[in-house]
């Protein structure tokens, strides 16, 4: 077993989150509004969930309009893979770390409101695109805005909740993901079928601007009221080095990159796969994917949040074990579902796969915050998003698109089916990484 080594930089008294400081005995925080001790701060969490909802909505509507968009501009699978993958993920990831540094010191609620409004306006402007290069520019502009979303969101949620209910809090936050995908696939498919793909972007952008204004009005920033208090005997250090010095955290990130590859490859290419292999139209595709990723994704996220909080009492490594089991099962069902001849049986297996694909993010997001302290929560979240987006979104959709074009000569319209085999392969790799991470404990859990 690898032995964890303490971080290299000098250690200073750890500054607990507001919620954990109350548990540590700081009476001055007991009457503070907005701090949830053993319970969920529902109003802030509702607003946080809405931010994640429009974050996924503005990102996923691109895949539901893949076929009409490709037909209008004559795009290849490789070009669409670039637009969905590395063309978005590279800028998103590069901006993530300076944004996280700001979020670790500044007003996260204000940052979230500004970022949400920015990416939503850029989403609406995507509807004015005239070809590949204007689409790429619009996607890059959306990425600039979305870079200010997830890291401060994770940091703020962790500071609002103590460790006893943190997984449930992140489960509520992550409900925005499947709900956003439901709206993107069902709503986007319906609008595209009734009007055109441009209208989809206009509507999604308007929804996002409204959410940004709500966040500006009602989302609290814990640090506005009172800074977190030092607690004797605890240690921390800010920045990335203390996190990356721990082998468990590195294994966690490796698994996250592989799972992200599978997740975003599935989200991006599932509509095209259903259209080509089962001749489904955009409206029916949106309904199937909306119910799959939306309804069953919600069930999966809620269940895994409850299970993780209960298991963690006896097993501190429960987060990694639950995530490893979920993606391991998803890998098996994904491999089976790709080659079932019947549309009905393939869709049933697809639902089970989606539940596994939806289940890993809550335990992994929570596990990342176990390694972090309030001084580097947003930085830890930025590392997580680096793995998910550059390793996952950047590689997954692009790789599938390139492989599909390479396999056209041998498999014609079925080339995408074989290119999607990277989904079960990367899920199996993620499961192995997280099982390894489960044997390693954080040096100073938060």
Which residues fall in each region the model found?
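Extracytoplasmic gate region of multi-pass secondary transporters
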Residues: 62-63, 247-301, 357, 361, ...
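Conserved MFS/SLC helix-loop-helix module at the cytosolic interface between two early adjacent transmembrane helices
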Residues: 94-133
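Juxtamembrane intracellular "pre-TM" segments in multi-pass secondary transporters
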Residues: 28-38, 222-253, 277
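Helix-breaking motifs and short loop linkers at transmembrane-helix boundaries and internal kinks
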Residues: 74, 107, 128-134, 145, ...
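Structural signature of the two symmetry-related core transmembrane helices
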Residues: 110-124, 318-334
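Cytoplasmic helix-loop-helix junction between adjacent transmembrane helices
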Residues: 138-178
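Helix-loop-helix hairpin linking two adjacent transmembrane segments in secondary transporters
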Residues: 173-217, 221
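Extracellular/periplasmic helix-loop-helix junction of adjacent transmembrane segments
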Residues: 65-94
């Amino acid at each position: 077993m690898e032995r964890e080594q303490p971080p290299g930089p000098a250690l200073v008294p750890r500054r607990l989150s507001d919620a954990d400081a109350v548990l540590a005995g700081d009476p001055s925080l007991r009457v503070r509004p907005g701090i949830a001790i053993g319970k969920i701060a529902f109003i802030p969490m509702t607003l946080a969930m809405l931010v994640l909802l429009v974050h996924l909505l503005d990102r996923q509507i691109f895949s539901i309009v893949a076929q009409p968009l490709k037909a209008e501009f004559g795009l290849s699978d490789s070009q669409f893979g670039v637009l969905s993958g590395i063309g978005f993920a590279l800028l998103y990831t590069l901006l993530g770390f300076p944004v996280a540094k700001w979020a670790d010191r500044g007003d996260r609620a204000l940052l979230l409101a500004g970022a949400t409004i920015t990416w939503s306006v850029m989403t609406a402007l995507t509807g004015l695109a005239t070809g590949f290069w204007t689409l790429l520019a619009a996607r890059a502009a959306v990425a600039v805005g979305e870079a200010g979303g997830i890291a401060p969101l994770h940091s703020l949620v962790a500071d609002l909740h103590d460790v006893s209910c943190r997984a449930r809090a992140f489960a509520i936050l992550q409900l925005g993901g499947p709900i956003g995908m439901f709206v993107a696939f069902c709503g986007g498919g319906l609008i595209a079928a009734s009007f055109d793909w441009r209208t989809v972007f206009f509507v999604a952008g308007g929804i996002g601007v409204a959410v940004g204004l709500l966040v500006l009005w009602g989302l609290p920033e814990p640090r506005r009221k009172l800074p977190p208090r030092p607690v004797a005997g605890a240690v921390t250090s800010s920045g990335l080095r203390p996190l990356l010095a721990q082998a468990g955290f590195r294994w966690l990130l490796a698994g996250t990159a592989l799972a992200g590859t599978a997740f975003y490859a599935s989200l991006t290419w599932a509509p095209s796969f259903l259209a080509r292999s089962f001749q489904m139209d955009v409206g029916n595709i949106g309904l199937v994917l909306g119910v799959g990723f939306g309804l069953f994704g919600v069930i999966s996220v809620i269940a895994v949040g409850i299970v993780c909080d209960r298991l963690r009492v006896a097993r501190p490594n429960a987060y990694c074990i639950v995530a490893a089991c979920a993606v391991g099962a998803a890998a098996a069902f994904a491999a089976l579902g790709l080659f079932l001849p019947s549309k009905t049986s393939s869709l049933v297996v697809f639902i089970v796969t989606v539940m596994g694909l939806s289940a890993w993010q809550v335990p992994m997001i929570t596990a990342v915050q176990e390694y972090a302290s309030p001084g580097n929560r947003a930085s830890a979240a930025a590392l997580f998003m680096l793995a998910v987006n550059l390793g996952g979104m950047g590689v997954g959709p692009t790789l599938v698109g390139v492989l599909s074009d390479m396999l056209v000569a041998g498999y014609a319209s079925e080339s995408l089916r074989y290119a999607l085999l990277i989904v079960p392969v990367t899920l199996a790799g993620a499961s192995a990484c997280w099982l390894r991470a489960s044997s390693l404990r954080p040096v100073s859990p938060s």
